[in-house]
Amino acid sequence: MGKNVVVLGSQWGDEGKGKIVDLLTEKASAVARFQGGHNAGHTLVVDGKTTILHLIPSGILREGVTCFIGNGVVLAPDALLKEMKNLEDNNVPVRERLRISPNCPLIMPYHVALDQAREAKRGSGKIGTTGRGIGPAYEDKVARRAIKLADLFRDDLEEKLRNLIEYHNFQLTQYYKVEAIDFDETLKLCQEWKEAIRGMVTDVTEDLNQLRLAGKNLMFEGAQGTLLDIDHGTYPFVTSSSVTAGGVSTGTGIGPLYLDYVLGITKAYTTRVGSGPFPTELFDDVGAHLAKVGHEFGATTGRARRCGWFDAEALRRAVVLNSMSGICLTKLDVLDGLEELLIGVGYNLPETECAGAHDAEFYESVTPKYETLQGWSESTVGITNYDELPENAKKYIKRIEVLIGCPIDIISTGPDREETIVLRDPYDA
């Protein structure tokens, strides 16, 4: 029988998931996205060529791999078609290999307008959204009024759309004081999307389960990271979907008992984009060094990422939340040359704080407890054999394993798919 592997972020996103999905799909027949939208930014480097994907699964660069977008994803058809064209212009066949669930809620122009209007009104209290309509689209889904991909093919689309635009335009014009969304233009867009996407719509749940029954290896690709999960993240500075392994089942229709291995992608230090608490954040030369050497700029927004020491306590919780089988430690090479490395091993918690909340106020109130390890002067760039790593790098890796209670199975030593140490392959585990 085949194996079903989940690959997801264990921090605040930007951990390097795209590269690892691309690497592991050598043994996979299909890759499925199960949550999020085009707010994701997965960077892949193959033979020195960089590709950034926002919506299409990272397995698209592997010949013969079928890519699925599950029902848990909020779909922006215009962004999808643009991404498809970019890939096809680079001789990557997409249309015949991409399959999309008809149950995906659509991101409409009014969602984008609402997202941007809300952030502008928050002023200094911004959550730090990408402004791409993700949150408002999920709101419509939960409120049971979303227009889903299937609705584009139904006779009552015009009536549904008219009612929704009337509803959202009231907020846009009366509360946010911005321009209304035009009904005719939006309806025309829907008609164009219908024709462009028609051939890719399929029952993703059925297709994935048929592949499973046929003994094929499947991969489920997460977006963002565990600490941005709508339920378990630093609320309200979170995304609007279920980012954890639990989201795989609800977002694709694959039952939880069919998931064989959960791989948590983790940077060798910690980063965060936008607003929100960050206990181990650095504001000194070391933080600037990590940002410069690690090229820490968001693939989706281009925003500079905040950098800090490795937070083992936050990762330990992510391991538990996702029942992680193993960790992939990325960007180890960024730490080359640092004399000392600090690891956050726990938090000092004020007596007034609500223990166990793990929301934004909780993380804002804590101060990290640190443990200091010696760094290494040798370069780890491109190393593919664990035994060739500097001794202090090995000690750093082993200490993290002890602190989080989970093995580090893969180590990334550079951006290219080949610059990787695989200690245990998830498909062979």
From Swiss-Prot:
Binds 1 Mg(2+) ion per subunit. InterPro entries: Adenylosuccin_syn_GTP-bd, Adenylosuccin_syn_Lys_AS, Adenylosuccinate_synth_dom1, Adenylosuccinate_synth_dom2, Adenylosuccinate_synth_dom3, Adenylosuccinate_synthetase, P-loop_NTPase. GO terms for biological process: 'de novo' AMP biosynthetic process; IMP metabolic process. It is found in: Cytoplasm. GTP binds at residues 13-19, 41-43, 305, 331-333, 412-414. Its cofactor is Mg(2+). Keywords: Cytoplasm, GTP-binding, Ligase, Magnesium, Metal-binding, Nucleotide-binding, Purine biosynthesis. GO terms for cellular component: cytoplasm. The active site is at D14 (proton acceptor), H42 (proton donor). Its main location: cytoplasm. The keyword rRNA-binding does not apply. IMP binds at D14, E15, G16, K17, N39, A40, G41, H42, T130, R144, Q224, T239, R303. The keyword Translocase does not apply. GO terms for molecular function: adenylosuccinate synthase activity; GTP binding; magnesium ion binding. Pathway: Purine metabolism; AMP biosynthesis via de novo pathway; AMP from IMP: step 1/2. It is an enzyme of class 6 (ligase). It catalyses: IMP + L-aspartate + GTP = N(6)-(1,2-dicarboxyethyl)-AMP + GDP + phosphate + 2 H(+). Its EC number is 6.3.4.4. Mg(2+) binds at D14, G41. Substrate binds at A299, T300, T301, G302, R303, A304, R305. SUPFAM superfamilies: P-loop containing nucleoside triphosphate hydrolases. It holds the Pfam family Adenylsucc_synt. Plays an important role in the de novo pathway of purine nucleotide biosynthesis. Catalyzes the first committed step in the biosynthesis of AMP from IMP. Homodimer. This is Adenylosuccinate synthetase. The lineage of its organism: Bacteria, Pseudomonadati, Pseudomonadota, Gammaproteobacteria, Moraxellales.
